[in-house]
Amino acid sequence: MEFKRIFNTVHDIINRLCQHGYKEYIIPPESTTPVELMEYISTIVSKLKAVTRQDERVYRCCGELIHCRINLRSVSMETWLTSPILCLTPRVRQAIEGRRDEIRRAILEPFLKDQYPALATLGLQSALKYEDFYLTKLEEGKLESLCQFFLRLAATVTTEIVNLPKIATLIPGINDGYTWTDVCRVFFTALACQKIVPATPVMMFLGRETGATASCYLMDPESITVGRAVRAITGDVGTVLQSRGGVGISLQSLNLIPTENQTKGLLAVLKLLDCMVMAINSDCERPTGVCVYIEPWHVDLQTVLATRGMLVRDEIFRCDNIFCCLWTPDLFFERYLSYLKGASNVQWTLFDNRADILRTLHGEAFTSTYLRLEREGLGVSSVPIQDIAFTIIRSAAVTGSPFLMFKDACNRNYHMNTQGNAITGSNLCTEIVQKADAHQHGVCNLASINLTTCLSKGPVSFNLNDLQLTARTTVIFLNGVLAAGNFPCKKSCKGVKNNRSLGIGIQGLHTTCLRLGFDLTSQPARRLNVQIAELMLYETMKTSMEMCKIGGLAPFKGFTESKYAKGWLHQDGFSTISYLDLPWCTLRDDICAYGLYNSQFLALMPTVSSAQVTECSEGFSPIYNNMFSKVTTSGELLRPNLDLMDELRDMYSCEEKRLEVINILEKNQWSVIRSFGCLSNSHPLLKYKTAFEYEQEDLVDMCAERAPFIDQSQSMTLFIEERPDGTIPASKIMNLLIRAYKAGLKTGMYYCKIRKATNSGLFAGGELTCTSCAL
């Protein structure tokens, strides 16, 4: 019966493709077994892939066919519950087994009727990402179904939440007298409608006995010798990497001048890390990575900046598998600005571990101590500030590393006083700000809110109330993940227990603006940009406070010593723009009175992986290209900008004219600017500019405008285009960093993406992608 239903669905999709004019690509299905039908689907999709460049209807139909293939590979509920490979935890399995009929009636049947059709028609990339990556591969080539996938996540969180007094009643739509199934249905629906998109480790491992569920791990082993650093790397770092977590590790304390007996210092440790990452990723479908944090006064700074790509000086110490981030004090930019204003002989001094106290300081305390150490002659060498700046920019542009973060902004706007015990680094993707030390890791559990699901139809508008409810649900969901999660080592468990840090981000900001008819950097879009951030921070903090006030839970450890307990809110450190009349004063008083269950709330991460299942733009970034192309082992994978394709179909009722426009776009790498020249501000296609065509200053300013309400940080990538002669404007990149510094941002540069002048379809400056934090 199930095979016949799927066969009929395939037949209906094939008929639609024929009606769209693609009969010559198709042989009608005559398959008599599931295996034959799966092979048939694979053949048809392979034939039609190239056509998706011109017809979004084919792209969506191919996605539906892949969903049929997923259904052909799926197993019964009984087989799924008892699968040794899936290995559900006993609590989750028992919770589902005891309510199977109730779950089927109240959750699964409504999903298949109401939500699944929209999910199945999102597109080819979405379907393939679920099939290849997120759905658990079971015995004999079988696959977890989408019903089972969403149920695993929702049931795991529900099982934890219903055991917390009164917490479930904080979920929108849940009242006193609720049942386990009521709560599970809310989470299931939020996941199935893609309102909440959990991080990759959560989707892969939550509810299972195997795998760790956190995305980001921050470490500072405080290693002052190579031996101690090696022990830290082969211990905790290796353990986390094998659990597929991404690592940000501060190695600033390993700051030795080379001697006869110790000639390589930090370089040798970086090489060990590089080899470890390469080995762990060599047989893994989900690669992870490491970002090493040092401050720009480290004695090995210039050597570290020559360990990747074409800048490598010594092949023995090539480290192309890891990244570096400069944890940069304000003093560096103050000196560079002094140089720009005409000051002569502006120097930057490098120190060894005799100046280790600088690692623990920030702000004025750092500056005064740095100046004193310079006067005392403890510097190892001095370099013209412009030479250091150029070396940093050249390395970022050519190799994609270093990233750059602002040490003082991160510490100044942290919820604890860190003077004398400063935060020393961030995570792999530069959006998490937590204190780590030799005894405790910083750990963050991530999820993003898909902004496109907050759009109301006819006429299209952004529903702030919907965002508010989703933000509240996400807080409860992630706290359930924290309670149920697996973590790879004791120091990670300690970090989770003490801080209960959440990292709630967004995805689909550009797509949302497109559907509203806004250019991403237009005034209406910039206003919405701030409203989204403010409402999310307010609602997440309010929900966390109510977990203490209404739910009776204890605040996070250290709350009484935190700035929160004294009435501080993150936006107090900024010149805040607000477009919403929210009762912040009342919330401030309530936090002082009742506390916060969680210590942190918002972190705007890249959503490279999960944005593929939602078919929307990544994070808060502009769309990179209106026709994304990726070559894989199975061939070229195309992902068109469906909003542009839909708009072209609406604009051109004549198919011949529409195809003519698409051919023009094809010849110009799908750039509307290159294809059609100077478009008027009111032209409907102007808003389809890509990341490299936006003024980067506007994108930095948008990050700055929402920064007061982002209590962690934002993975801000810069998109730079080569000049026609193939040169990269280093001053352009440096000016953007200065702009970010002056705006008080915490992250100045995640990736620096360079588009080649010779081929506008190519990127450079960082080909590796983090899928740990990238959701």
Curated annotation (Swiss-Prot):
This protein's UniProt keywords: ATP-binding, Disulfide bond, DNA replication, Early protein, Nucleotide-binding, Oxidoreductase, Viral latency, Viral reactivation from latency
Keyword Nucleotide-binding listed: yes
SUPFAM superfamilies: PFL-like glycyl radical enzymes
Disulfide partners: 216-444
Catalytic activity: a 2'-deoxyribonucleoside 5'-diphosphate + [thioredoxin]-disulfide + H2O = a ribonucleoside 5'-diphosphate + [thioredoxin]-dithiol
Swiss-Prot/TrEMBL GO biological process terms: deoxyribonucleotide biosynthetic process; DNA replication; release from viral latency
Active site location: 427 (proton acceptor), 429 (cysteine radical intermediate), 431 (proton acceptor)
Function: Ribonucleoside-diphosphate reductase holoenzyme provides the precursors necessary for viral DNA synthesis. Allows virus growth in non-dividing cells, as well as reactivation from latency in infected hosts. Catalyzes the biosynthesis of deoxyribonucleotides from the corresponding ribonucleotides.
HAMAP family in the cross-refs: HSV_RIR1 (MF_04026)
Family, as annotated: Belongs to the ribonucleoside diphosphate reductase large chain family.
Full protein name: Ribonucleoside-diphosphate reductase large subunit
Organism: Varicella-zoster virus (strain Dumas) (HHV-3)
